[in-house]
Swiss-Prot record:
The keyword Cell cycle does not apply. Belongs to the AAE transporter (TC 2.A.81) family. It is a multi-pass membrane protein. It is found in: Cell membrane. One of its GO terms (molecular function) is identical protein binding. Keywords: Antiport, Cell membrane, Membrane, Plasmid, Transmembrane, Transmembrane helix, Transport. Signal peptide: none annotated. This is Aspartate/alanine antiporter.
Amino acid sequence: MNAIGNFLVGTPVFTIFICLALGYLLGKLKIGSFTLGATVGVLIVALLIGQLGVFPRDTLLGDIFFDFFMFAIGYRVGPSFISSMKKFGAKIVYATLIFLVSAFIVAYACFKMFHIGPGIAAGIIAGGLTQSAVIGSSLETISKLPISDHLKTLYSNQIPIVYTLTYVFGTIGVLIFLRDIMPKLMHIDLKKQAVKTAKELDMIPVPVIVASTHFYTINDGSSLIGQTLGTVNTKFAKGLVAAGLNDSADMASVINAGDVLAISGGIDEIGRAVQEFNLLEVTGKTKAYVSKQVVLKKNFSADVLKNAQDKGVLVATLAGDVMDPAQFSTLKPAESVTLVGQKDAVSEVQSQLGRLRAAENIINYSWFALGIALSAALGIVGTKVSGVPIALGGGTASLIVGLVQSIYRDKHAHMDTIPDSLLEFFQSIGLNLFIATVGLSAAKTFISAIQSMGISVLLIGAVISILPHIITFVICYYLMKMEPISIIGAQTGADTLSAALNDVSERVGSDASPFFAAAVAPAYAIGNIFLTLMGPIFIVLLS
């Protein structure tokens, strides 16, 4: 056993990544509808493996990946934060702040009443309020406290252990309250209420008929023979354009039997035109026709849309749904459209409308690196509380910078971005690699810490998990008269409870899940920032 322990301590790269591998597997295990999740799985594995030796924590490695994690959260939630605020207004923010203030007051009262120390308090906030980022921000604050190294080690080791103990009720207990108990208290059917409100707010997804270009041979006897391409364009139904003839977009071209006509539009409209004008589809594609996404440089009138269609260019939404003139004229600068048609004609129209939108799958490495660099600089900004310096911290700064950068990029979509798949990777691996380093270093004190803390930590954690939700529900529903699903969404986001987001989204169904996610988004961003700061604040107040 000593040989295994020595090997694990001596090869930290192997140890950390075996914790990740086994932790992700453990996190997938289901108990009923509950899954531990990757973070708890990695922490449990790290605490178990950590019993085999003394593992010093690599703070630089952990901090870098923790910053990656927080930056990814901010970047992913940025655009939805703004759109959700526009739809729901200030009430979601009020509900979020009510929850956060309630959580702080309840937690502070419990900590004082039961004489809870700084490390245990931060662990309860992290686990009971399901905000694992508190672990990183609290460890950073502990390192700056004017206390002995022994106490710093004690507090640092207590945090991940208490997090593990309180996380289960913080997830399951609160999930049951939000998903099952609150709807009954409000006398609603979760799915029916969500669909009803989503319809009222025009947030039910509408099936999109994607515009594309298809090619057809002009048969003998077709009524289009002898007409110009421009004339045919005027005869087509709304939502269709004659994009080109024999790969040319010259609207003066005369149509003859055997020519190949390109038609852009929705497949249903194209099908009706094929029947009406006696056309035969040609298989295969040609490089002469393209689809390009364009970022508008200013407001345009409906006449601009008509001019584009007169040139054989179809204008559609980003999703590919054909736009009508009224819809086009309401678009604002920095919004995007899709142009479909012959490449020369599309290029001409694109130059009038704005810049090409950058592809979403191209990684802007400079943008990402700049974000992390700015986060490190912003993270040192802070103040002193009771003589102890409290900085924003690299993690919280990363979340804020990610949020700002994503909103900026959303307004300047010609810039390359950071693909969501990469952000998802950083969000998951960044947090869990950090958690693995923390768990390994704290493992040796795990058993003794549980024995010394007893059942009281679980009970205090349960109170801090659930009581702020009850207070927020009473105020928002009975006093503020908020819409029920918005209340559940705000409390889910404020508590950064991903399990509730996933579970309630499934319960309300695919039609209403975008509405519920939109209610969660602004609260989630605010909750991430303030809960992450709450741990360090309690560290200072209780030291």
